[in-house]
Amino acid sequence: IDLTSPDTTVALLELDAVIGLRGTVEAVNGRKTLTRVGVTCALCHSTVDDSFAPGIGKRLDGWPNRDLNPGAIIALSPALDAGTRSVFNSWGKGKYDPRFNLDGINGPQVIPPAYGLAGVARITTTGDGDEIAYWNRYVAVTQMGGHGSFSDSRTGVDVRNGTDDLVTSRLPALQAYQLTLAAPTPPAGS
């Protein structure tokens, strides 16, 4: 299998075999074509155990994807000026700045795990919210452009995308799932 072929990528997306990406594949002029793509939380908060080959294996939900370089991906946008592109490229693998698009201050942090959070107070990496749902809403609306709203007078953030709300109804189930993700057993001697 040629993993560098766009046709392979389309086939994997059609099979829902790419962690963190969801695609709609349709026949266009007799050829399978990716007509829509979306990003899920798993892009940053799941990885694989490399049991088959590097980057291929059993899915590990809640584990931070420290191989992912979100800044380099975002920097590919033709809408960015050179200075902003440079900031995104400075982050490196496994890091992300969830506030940069709002405050313009370059402050990347290591992508945190989404496991072992049951019973943790001030559960978000920034300490802003008490529940994971706070952060899930923040990321869904302010980072991923999800249809809904996020507002916090303490931080001055008030973002509304669209007139419908496709975020709120999904938050309870997502939070419940995240709270079931136990932290892995530490390696011996660590």
Predicted regions and their residues:
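Periplasmic c-type cytochrome electron-transfer domains
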Residues: I1-S190
